[in-house]
């Protein structure tokens, strides 16, 4: 057959192609690239398994792959992939390539729309809106595409004709997509968010890989589950929540329930208010968003006992004080008489308790100046101002809308000032009369001498005097006598050399004696 030699020639050329890169570096040794030299020296036994180096891309010098998320450099400068680089950094040796085995494939039925319901349990077949972000579904598609583009499938096809090669490749890819899928070596599942490998290089699923890394043994098949439960990706729940929110927003706002009214008159008013809320179209101005508290006619209608528990909010505070809140008036006559201008006056209400009279305000800064107020009198009150306390009036004491505090029917006494006793002018003069001022010549009594009157004299404050003892006598010169002018004027005529007696020396006044008298 003439076609046999032509067919044998390309077959022989294809078999010799992996050998050509080995011969080229020997012939062109000075022009060898650093990526080819370590392959010849260190990894010569891997050349039969690795495909030839592409002319337009990069290739790992260890495993021969052309795709990696990060290219690295080995210590000898060669280009390696990310997996080989991480393995070398942790183990200080190159990653073994012979342990990498092709994944297992099993036949599956092709499903156009998929059977995954999207309720958080993924079976890897698609069919839901949430499958776009599902790692199990996406990894399954990527694994199928990588499997159909593997070099094993390319080498098995014979390059007889280019047209035939294209047709067979397209048919094979469609068959692979419909009938083949990667399966776990341990449990046989085809659904996993991440494919792993054990120490033997077998492809296992994420669950088996985590169990193997934790326990050091393969996961029992009884623990296998048909579906994978994902986290917080329930599209159905989100849709249901959105529908509920849209449904609630479309509905009209609910009118607040009518408060309990004590009288039929208030019921009619409340009915009018509800009618207004239903007829208005603008919800921002409708009164049902803010409804004022109902105004009860306390002065004309009694309050039922059944409504006290519903409206009463705070318990009444009662203090023992001369001022007391006005009771609920049950008739117009009493209300008009209690608010007469001559009988009572309005006092503003306060949240603080009254002054107790102990000199300090409760919760106040300190004592109050002035005496405490007088205690309330116990006199009888007129008939029209008597307060009749009943259980119903005490229970509804906190339901008053305008709280008017009135006094009792008494007039408070004036503030008592401390009494000051003032004596007459005659008695005060007799008791507190000072002795009259007398002249120097008069004597206070018969035994005492008259007051001493010293003539004005000049004192030299620079001179100092000392008193000598009785035994020692000092002689003063004329200059000393002139300096000390405290001597009597009668002794002016003295001899210059005559000594001065002690008595005469003592008669001289010093500053201390002058000041002390």
Swiss-Prot record:
A single Gene Ontology CC term: nucleus
Zinc-finger is among the record's keywords: yes
Record keywords, A-Z: Cytoplasm, Iron, Metal-binding, Nucleus, Repeat, Repressor, Transcription, Transcription regulation, Zinc, Zinc-finger
Biological process per Gene Ontology, one example term: cellular response to iron ion
Chief place where the protein resides: cytoplasm
Induction of its expression: Repressed by the HAP43 transcription regulator. Expression is also under the control of MAC1.
Region named Disordered: 1-61, 147-172, 222-435, 472-517
GO function term, MF aspect, one: transcription cis-regulatory region binding
Lineage: superkingdom: Eukaryota
Biased composition annotated in UniProt, kind: Basic residues: 222-233
Biased composition (Basic and acidic residues): 147-164, 234-245, 476-507
Compartments in which it is found: Cytoplasm; Nucleus
Composition bias type Low complexity, residue spans: 263-289, 327-358, 423-432
Functional note: Transcriptional regulator of iron-responsive genes. Represses expression of SEF1 and genes for iron uptake if iron is present. Plays also a transcription-independent role in the direct inhibition of SEF1 function through protein complex formation and translocation to the cytoplasm, where SEF1 is destabilized. Promotes gastrointestinal commensalism in mice.
UniProt protein name: Suppressor of ferric uptake 1
Source organism per UniProt: Candida albicans (strain SC5314 / ATCC MYA-2876) (Yeast)
Gene transcribed to yield this protein: SFU1
């Amino acid at each position: 057959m003439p076609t046999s030699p032509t067919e044998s020639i390309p077959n022989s050329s294809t078999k010799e192609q992996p050998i050509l890169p080995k011969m080229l570096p020997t012939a062109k040794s000075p022009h060898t690239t650093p990526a080819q030299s370590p392959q010849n020296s260190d990894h010569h036994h891997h050349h039969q398994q690795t495909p030839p180096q592409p002319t337009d891309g990069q290739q790992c010098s260890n495993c021969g792959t052309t795709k990696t998320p990060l290219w690295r450099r080995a210590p000898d400068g060669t280009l390696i992939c990310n997996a080989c680089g991480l393995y070398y950094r942790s183990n200080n040796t190159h990653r073994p390539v012979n342990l990498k085995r092709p994944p297992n494939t099993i036949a599956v039925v092709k499903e156009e729309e998929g059977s995954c319901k999207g309720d958080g349990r993924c079976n890897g077949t698609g069919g839901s809106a949430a499958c776009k972000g599902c790692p199990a579904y996406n990894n399954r598609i990527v694994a199928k595409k990588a499997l159909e583009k593997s070099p094993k499938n390319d080498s098995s096809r014979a390059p007889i004709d280019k047209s035939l090669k294209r047709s067979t490749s397209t048919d094979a890819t469609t068959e692979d997509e419909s009938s083949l899928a990667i399966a776990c070596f341990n449990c046989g599942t085809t659904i996993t968010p991440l494919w792993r490998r054990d120490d033997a290089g077998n492809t296992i699923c994420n669950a088996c890989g985590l169990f193997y890394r934790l326990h050091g043994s393969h996961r029992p098949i009884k623990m296998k589950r048909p579906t994978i439960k994902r986290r917080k990706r329930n599209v159905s729940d989100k849709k249901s929540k959105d529908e509920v929110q849209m449904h609630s927003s479309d509905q009209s706002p609910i009118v607040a329930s009518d408060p309990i009214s004590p009288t039929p008159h208030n019921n009619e008013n409340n009915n009018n208010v509800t009618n207004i809320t239903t007829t208005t179209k603008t919800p921002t101005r409708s009164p049902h968003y803010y409804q004022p508290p109902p105004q009860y006619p306390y002065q004309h209608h009694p309050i039922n006992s059944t409504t006290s528990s519903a409206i009463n909010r705070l318990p009444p505070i009662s203090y023992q004080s001369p001022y007391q809140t006005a009771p609920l008036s049950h008739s117009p006559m009493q209300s008009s008489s209690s608010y007469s201008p001559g009988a009572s006056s309005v006092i503003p209400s306060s949240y603080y308790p009254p002054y107790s009279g102990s000199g300090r305000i409760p919760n106040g800064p300190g004592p109050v100046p002035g005496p405490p107020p007088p205690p309330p009198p116990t006199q009888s009150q007129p008939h029209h101002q008597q307060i009749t306390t009943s259980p119903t009036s005490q229970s509804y004491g906190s339901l008053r809308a305008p709280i008017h505090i009135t006094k009792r029917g008494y007039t408070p006494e004036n503030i008592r000032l401390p009494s000051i006793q003032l004596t007459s002018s005659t008695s005060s003069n007799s008791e507190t009369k000072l002795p009259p001022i007398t002249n120097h010549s008069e004597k206070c009594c018969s035994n005492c001498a008259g007051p001493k009157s010293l003539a004005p004299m000049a004192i030299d404050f620079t001179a100092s005097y000392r008193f000598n003892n009785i035994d020692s006598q000092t002689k003063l010169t004329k200059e000393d006598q002139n300096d000390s002018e405290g001597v009597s004027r009668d002794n002016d005529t003295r001899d210059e050399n005559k000594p001065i007696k002690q008595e005469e020396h003592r008669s001289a006044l010093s500053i201390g004696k002058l000041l002390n008298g």
